[in-house]
Amino acid sequence: MERGTSDEVGYATGLWHMVQAGLRELFPGYFALIMATGIISLACGMLGLPILAQALFRLNIVNYAVIATLMLARLIGYPRLMLADLTDHARGPGFFTSIAGSCVLGTQFVVIGHESSVAWILWGVGVTLSFTVIYAFFAAVTLRGVKPDLETGINGAWLIATVGSQSIAILSTLLLPTAGAYKTALVTFALIMYLMGCMTYLTIIPLILYRFTFFRLTPAELTPPYWINMGAVAITTLAGATLIMNAGRSSLLTAILPFLKGLTLYFWATATWWIPLLLILGVWRHLYRHFPLRYSPQYWGMVFPLGMYTACTIRLSQAVDLPLLAPVTPYLLAIALFAWSLTFAGLIHELVRDFGRPRLPESPARPH
């Protein structure tokens, strides 16, 4: 009996220390799980798979609640670590996923849940985070005295700034029917966020391509978030297509419709251009250089672009009347679902392993 009690106390102590260590080192970009699950759910709905779309929607509500709770717990328990991560060139952009995650879930509430009141709350969260997190990060990395060089300071996660802006543009456009007297203001805001997202992509992507081509790139440095090179323009395509499909609600959108169509096609072509190169780099990383393929939360940064490319291709084919794109979309969705399933299985395996064998840490990894 005493042995059993001692084991239970030891397990509980180990579990508590494991939770503390997990909060200290919590990956800032974990909202990418919500982004990936949400966009694949929406793509399933677009292709007539309502049961799967609903299941992923309900799962995403749980995902959001858990991750938001963990992030708040980390903010309360380890504010200095949160601030250090936010102002770090490499880890800081991960916080941008909270913007996109909130708005992607809000889009699910509109499209799948048919519940605009919750979507408005998530829209407010996304907009607030956009104007706090993004400007806090860029101000911090601009003003800090010691800065990394381009080789170590930039990565694909920087483009989540674009993803965040475009996710707000999409949700804002979808909320137009419930905006009432504020419809004109909301559609103008949606268009501004869309153009801001275009601006950030066109500003950041030359730096990433320059880093790719003129600096040594190791397998460890070729992280999954580099798929956001494609995902950022995929969501820009989806935002443009959403504005085009809702142009009848606004004289402003109607006036610039040819511009929107051309720009949207341009960004879809850019997203398509990236896919072969990213596949080649992935083969080089894992098959040629034998970099181990094991679960990391960063892989959600690869799953999201796959789902987003599927969704944007579906909507683009409808927005600009390009039916020739439609036949390929079920295959794109199958690939995205396969990638999501593997990554989610990796997450579950890691959780089962960690909670099954909690260990006492030797010492805290970083101070509060």
Language model feature labels by segment:
Residues 12-42, 57, 79-107, 123-126, ...:
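Juxtamembrane helix-loop boundaries in multi-pass membrane proteins
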Residues 44-55:
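Short, hydrophobic transmembrane alpha-helix segments
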Residues 50-51, 179-187, 247-258, 287-291, ...:
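Extracellular/periplasmic helix-loop-helix junctions in multi-pass membrane proteins
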Residues 61-76, 130-139:
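Central hydrophobic cores of alpha-helical transmembrane segments in multi-pass inner-membrane proteins
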Residues 63, 268-270, 327-342:
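Small-residue-rich transmembrane alpha-helices that serve as helix-helix interface/gating elements
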Residues 103-144, 173, 187-190, 203, ...:
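Hydrophobic, ordered structural segments
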Residues 158-281:
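Generic multipass alpha-helical transmembrane bundles of integral membrane proteins
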Residues 260-318:
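Extended, compositionally biased non-globular segments
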